[in-house]
């Protein structure tokens, strides 16, 4: 049974368990520390999840947690794919009386994957990730989520001449949310790709329709702080390079950072001043290149290293360290499910001339195929 068949089996079973994702989350609340997500914040997450189908529990979902903020807030993320129950839910909503901007954007994107733009599917496959601003939103007005594509079918290594594929992914995201195409924005994103070292890869493309326009890029695989600095200098990133290099050097002194990822915001005017740093300490990659979860990382050394940063909340670091666990068996009406959970990544945020934020990203995913 391949990964898509396993997801389909799990979705069929979840559909018999309930209707919306909030019903599933209600059963999982006991495993999430109140230091990470408070009760009032949890209710806001549930309000969002009530608009999503329970079948999305068969693909990774989880939370973005601000480790620098004592308030127990969280943003929410979930995954779906064209051609299965989760994607069909949004297509049906777009055709029906409950159509909304999000379902229409998803339907337009899936139409490109399935028929209109086969080149897109050859790069990113047929999955999509959504990121909902909840804890970070001022008013929680139900605005559109961020939409993210990952090039899982074709790895976009630097130096491989794949700038056309980069443009294909950008075009798809821009058009699906109804933005006007901007040639200079597209060229700027391709310029970032062309500046990548050969052994780095373009890991994801994202847009946030409810924020100021930009293309969010994730680039993984930088080996040293010096390599990061040189890359950012080539692109004329408008921040303080010494702050970036110093932050990575401090972490290297406390623990062995094997690779580093970067998050950049790219627009028609060039690169934005906010930069995300994703240190990776030790990783085992998944056997299936189409896996929804890249691999298993030993995050504890990095969490221990972050304790040395005075602005990081110690209680949240402790709670995050407790999050990684072995597979858990859940018992439901249709039988057993296996739940996998863990830390997906940790990101440090540099804004211009200072390191000011740390965020933890945790995931959960259920399988009803492993348990039958």
Could you describe each region identified by the protein language model?
Residues 2-129:
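An N-terminal, globular interaction/scaffold subdomain
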Residues 31-34, 52-55, 116, 176, ...:
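Surface-exposed polar/charged interaction patches
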Residues 35-67, 119-133, 194-206, 261, ...:
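Short, compositionally biased low-complexity segments enriched in polar/charged residues
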Residues 69, 140-142, 208-213, 217, ...:
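Edge/loop elements at the starts and ends of beta-strands within beta-rich repeat scaffolds
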Residues 74-81, 143-154, 212-225, 274-283, ...:
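Extracellular/lumenal glycan-associated surfaces
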Residues 80-108, 157-178, 223-243, 289-308, ...:
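Extended intrinsically disordered, low-complexity coil regions enriched in Ser, Thr, Gly, Ala
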Residues 108-158, 162-224, 228-241:
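Extended, well-ordered protein cores
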């Amino acid at each position: 049974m391949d990964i898509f068949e396993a997801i389909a089996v799990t979705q069929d079973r979840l559909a018999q368990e309930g209707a919306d994702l909030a019903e599933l989350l209600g059963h999982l609340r006991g495993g999430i520390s109140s230091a990470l997500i408070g009760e009032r914040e949890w209710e806001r997450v549930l309000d969002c999840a009530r608009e999503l189908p329970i079948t999305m529990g068969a693909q990774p979902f989880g939370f973005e947690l601000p480790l620098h903020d004592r308030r127990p807030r969280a943003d929410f993320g979930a995954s779906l794919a064209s051609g299965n129950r989760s994607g069909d839910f949004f297509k049906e909503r777009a055709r029906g009386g409950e159509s909304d901007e999000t379902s229409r954007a998803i339907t337009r994107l899936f139409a490109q994957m399935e028929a209109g733009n086969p080149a897109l599917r050859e790069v990113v496959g047929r999955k999509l990730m959504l990121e909902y601003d909840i804890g970070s939103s001022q008013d929680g007005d139900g605005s559109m989520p961020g939409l993210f594509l990952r090039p899982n079918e074709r790895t976009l290594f630097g130096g491989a001449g794949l700038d056309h594929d980069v443009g294909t992914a950008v075009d798809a995201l821009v058009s699906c949310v109804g933005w006007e195409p901007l040639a200079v924005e597209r060229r700027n994103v391709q310029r970032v790709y062309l500046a990548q070292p050969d052994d780095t890869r373009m890991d994801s493309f994202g847009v946030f329709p409810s924020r100021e326009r930009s293309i969010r890029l994730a680039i993984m695989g930088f080996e040293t702080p010096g390599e990061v600095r040189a890359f950012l200098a080539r692109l004329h990133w408008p921040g303080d390079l010494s702050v970036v290099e110093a932050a990575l050097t401090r972490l290297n002194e406390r623990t062995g950072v094997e690779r580093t990822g970067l998050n950049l915001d790219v627009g028609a005017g060039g690169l934005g001043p906010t930069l995300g740093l994703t240190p990776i300490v030790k990783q085992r990659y998944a056997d299936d290149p189409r896996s929804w979860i890249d691999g298993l990382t030993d995050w504890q050394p990095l969490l221990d290293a972050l304790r040395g940063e005075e602005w990081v909340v110690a209680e949240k670091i402790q709670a995050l360290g407790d999050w990684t666990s072995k597979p858990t068996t859940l018992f439901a009406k249709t039988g057993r499910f296996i739940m996998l959970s863990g830390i997906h990544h940790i990101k440090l945020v540099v804004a211009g001339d200072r390191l000011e934020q740390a965020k933890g990203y945790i995931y959960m995913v259920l399988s009803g195929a492993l348990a039958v």
